[in-house]
Design a protein with these regions (language model features):
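Short alpha-helical transmembrane segments in multi-pass integral membrane proteins
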Residues: 1-23, 81-148, 190-245, 303-368, ...
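Interfacial/gating helices of multi-pass transporter permease domains
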Residues: 42-64, 131-135, 195-196, 236-244, ...
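Short runs within selected transmembrane alpha-helices of multi-pass transporters and secretion channels
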Residues: 74, 143-161, 169-177, 198-211, ...
Length: 457
């Protein structure tokens, strides 16, 4: 630990950035594969690929809500457990973990019951048509029955990470992703199960990951053990955890609201093909944003440590290294999408009509995709510098203040209303990127003014 601290304060910034960013980047890429592999296989189902992909895409709002509830307990409980560990109060840390596990299991029962029976009506509301609804229901109901595994994996894996077992935590995702990738073609094409096979593959992969987590947290290697005696809910233990997790819950649940806003509007103005295109666009957007998150996760400890040590020259170097990588990646990826939109659309479906429509939509929806690198790198840097509230506000600025209202406002000013809905994304992207970047550099300049009074190495 001492050597790590010395390296963080004196070692090569670029080398340290690479050492810390690569594992985080690998984890994000694995997560990305987990998220989009089902859609790639489904989109290439013979004859029904386009309709099936559209139907499965309509399940996204429910999936995001399940994720949000997992984060409520996981993202709120893990930091509290870490604090208790730092205070040498292992018993309290284990009690926190046990209480969070109980909440996740209670949520699993409630969400499974509510969403299983309500999903046909919800999917209709989200924009499902007679052609896409059967595929949406087929995938959704199987996935929902496996919610207990999903909540376990997303919520409890954070307690492995917070103990310092980063590799074990990463393996949780890798194991699930590999099983999902292997099972998808076997069940979908080998056994002819189609969409149902994709859902079963996802649930089985999550189940294996859940067993992996529980075996670790009840085994000999873990620092904190999951014990039955700690699963009885204690208000003084669980309420602070849920209070801390509410910001993560809000961030993820707003993604659900955003998805509903897009699909309901596009269903109304563009029909199934527009909703299907949105499913592909969401996946392509993840190809942009998730690697950026990995880079920023690697840069965060380096920026935070040197900021705390008042080594502002190293903070500056670390930030601009992160900023440069993020902007370069998004610019190159954006240029490739603008030049070869049909190629990117074709990755997700073999439906010719959907490919052509999606290729057109890519050039509208991602017209300002290059700006995402600016926004995410600056927003995450705010977080690394301890400015969590500003970081949260900047994230909500794009989604809640700009994008969601624009989805409903812009169609009033254009004859092609589906075009107007897609246009909301680049408008929100460029405005949010400009505001976030300007605010960060103003903050950064103020920080630089304090440099004269600080000792730098």
């Amino acid at each position: 630990m001492a050597n790590m601290k010395r390296d963080m304060g004196t070692g090569s910034v670029k080398k340290l950035m690479a050492q810390m960013a690569v594992p985080a980047l690998v984890g994000q890429v694995v997560n990305l594969l987990y998220n989009i592999v089902d859609r790639i296989y489904i989109g290439h189902l013979p004859e029904i690929g386009g309709a099936a992909l559209t139907g499965v895409g309509l399940f996204t709002p429910i999936l995001m809500l399940i994720t949000a509830f997992a984060m409520l307990a996981g993202a709120g409980g893990a930091p509290r457990a870490a604090i208790a560990m730092g205070q040498k109060n292992k018993e309290k840390a284990e009690q926190i973990m046990g209480n969070c596990f109980s909440v996740l299991m209670i949520l699993a029962v409630i969400l499974t019951g509510v969403f299983y029976f309500a999903c046909p009506d919800l999917l209709r509301w989200f924009g499902a048509s007679d052609a896409t609804l059967p595929y949406a229901i087929e995938y959704a109901q199987i996935y929902i029955l496996g919610s207990v595994f999903v909540l376990n994996v997303m919520g409890m894996n954070t307690f492995i990470t917070t103990q310092g077992f980063a590799k074990i935590s990463m393996l949780t995702t890798v194991i699930g992703a590999v099983i999902n990738i292997v099972l998808d073609p076997i069940l979908m094409f080998g056994f002819g199960m189609g969409v149902k096979g994709a859902a079963i593959a996802t649930v089985l992969s999550q189940a294996v990951s859940a067993v992996w987590i529980l075996r670790f947290l009840t085994g000999k290697q873990t620092i904190l053990k999951l014990r039955l005696k700690n699963m009885r809910l204690v208000p003084s233990i669980i309420l602070p955890c849920l209070g801390l997790g509410i910001s993560s819950f809000i961030m993820v649940s707003t993604e659900s609201v955003l998805s509903i806003s897009f699909t309901t509007s596009l269903s109304r103005f563009g029909g199934d093909v527009a909703v299907g295109a949105m499913t592909v666009l969401t996946s392509i957007n993840q190809l942009i944003t998730m690697p950026l998150s990995g880079v920023c996760q690697g840069g965060q400890p380096l920026i935070s440590y040197n900021y705390g040590a008042k080594k502002y020259a190293r903070v500056k170097e670390a930030f601009f290294c992160q900023f440069g990588v993020c902007v370069a990646y998004t610019t190159v990826f954006w240029a490739a999408m603008m030049i070869f939109p049909n190629f990117f659309a074709g990755i997700f479906t073999s439906d010719t009509g959907l490919v052509e429509y999606t290729a057109w939509a890519i050039r509208v929806f991602l017209a300002c995709g290059f700006s995402v690198g600016f926004q995410i790198s600056c927003q995450q840097a705010f977080m690394a510098l301890g400015q969590a509230k500003i970081s949260l506000i900047m994230a909500l600025l794009r989604k809640v203040i700009l994008l969601i209202p624009l989805i409903f406002i812009l169609p009033n000013f254009f004859a092609d209303k589906a075009f107007a809905v897609f246009l909301a994304e680049p408008v929100a992207d460029i405005v949010a990127a400009a505001v976030t970047t300007i605010m960060f550099f103003r903050f950064f300049m103020k920080m630089q003014k304090t440099r004269n009074g600080a000792t730098n190495e």
